[in-house]
């Protein structure tokens, strides 16, 4: 039976990345967030919306395109996350929606915990500025599909 390790996925590096990002994520919260890091889904107490006349939920997904290549070439990963949040939040506010929460998806060729933590720190910083909770995410290691230093982010 093949294992993650046999396929080139480093679970230990992923676990280290989670430990490194916990402090950043804690800063990107709202009182309505239920639960913590590591669950299969982020939970948000929607009863906070009951005071609204006609509460509607809006959602948006976006990425940062080729800016990931600029971040990679510069070796600077903490600003790309903030840019990601700006793209998602902008798409929501133009509809008149309040961005309540978001999740992230980070795909990498090889997990470098410090790089992942820097990306998430930027996402958390952007979320804090927008009063938006970061309630979940996924870091996916794709050896063979992406080069070791390649990555993409979406939220």
What are these regions (language model features)?
Residues 23-155:
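Glycine-rich phosphate/pyrophosphate-binding loop regions near the starts of catalytic domains
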């Amino acid at each position: 039976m093949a294992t993650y390790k046999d396929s080139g996925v480093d679970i230990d590096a992923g676990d280290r990345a989670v430990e490194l990002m916990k402090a950043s994520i804690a800063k990107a919260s709202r009182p309505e967030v239920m639960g913590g890091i590591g669950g299969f889904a982020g939970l948000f107490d929607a009863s906070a919306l009951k005071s609204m006349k006609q509460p509607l939920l809006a959602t948006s997904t976006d990425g940062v395109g080729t800016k990931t290549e600029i971040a990679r070439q510069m070796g600077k990963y903490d600003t790309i996350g903030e840019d990601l949040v700006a793209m998602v939040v902008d798409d929501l506010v133009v509809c008149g929606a309040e961005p309540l929460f978001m999740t992230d998806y980070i795909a990498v060729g090889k997990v470098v915990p410090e790089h992942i933590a820097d990306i998430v720190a930027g996402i958390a910083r952007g979320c804090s500025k927008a009063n938006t909770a970061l309630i979940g995410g996924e870091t996916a290691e794709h050896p063979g599909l992406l080069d070791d230093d390649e990555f993409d982010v979406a939220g």
